[in-house]
């Protein structure tokens, strides 16, 4: 799994509202890690497609208190 800190720094928009992590090999563990990151509270759109995050990864994102502003999530 890639370094989550580096990915957030490189892939989060300047306004903190869009996170594009398409095809970054995150898997379930990466999705769970993202779901704990307080610095992502302003994210409104996130692309996690082609990451193989699985059911548990999706559950972690869905139940996360971090992503309260999330309105658009791509998992395809």
Describe each model-derived feature in a short phrase:
Residues 19-21, 43-48, 71-75:
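Conserved hydrophobic beta-strand positions in leucine-rich repeat
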Residues 34, 48, 61-62:
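Core hydrophobic positions of leucine-rich repeats
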């Amino acid at each position: 799994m890639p370094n989550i800190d580096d990915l957030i720094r490189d892939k989060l928009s300047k306004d903190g509202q869009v996170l594009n992590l398409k095809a970054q090999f995150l898997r379930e563990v990466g999705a769970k890690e993202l779901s704990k990151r307080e610095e992502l509270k302003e994210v409104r759109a996130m692309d996690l497609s082609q990451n193989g995050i699985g059911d548990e990864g999706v559950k972690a994102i869905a139940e996360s208190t971090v992503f309260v502003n999330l309105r658009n999530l791509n998992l395809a």
